[in-house]
Amino acid sequence: MAGVDAFLKLDGIKGESTDKSHKDEIEILSFSWGCHSSTSIGQGGGGGVGKATFSDFTFQKKVDISSPKLALIAARGDHIRSAKISVRKAGGAAGQVDYQVYDLEKIYVTGVQISGGDGGVFYETLTLSPTKFKWEYKQQGDDGSLTGNMAVTVDRAANTAQ
């Protein structure tokens, strides 16, 4: 994510970020999530769309102080009460601005995978499954300032989105 920084703030879990706006959060190298909705087009008379299925959030990060605690939470089947993902980029005179923010609730740790070692760096693939999340995207104007936003809230337990 060249020119873009991303941070993960987990309730009760410290990371190693020294960034003044995201101190003690987890620095994210990359992350992904998505949704899929199947249709019945070409399978009979009409056409319809089924309910969407949302994938878990998968993060790539360096192994840090949060890694053992995340593995423990996964092993115990506990959940994390809340989390925030902040994605930022250059904002002109405003400096760095968070232009994408995800607020997650009741999050299960569904995967912790450690790999690497070449050059002494170990990486972690972390998979989180939130029960509910809100994604807010903030549009950036020509001067770099944030000018508008769009948001969606997904409740995976109720299988609803708005």
Model-derived segments and their meaning:
Residues 1-162:
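Glycine-rich, low-complexity intrinsically disordered segments
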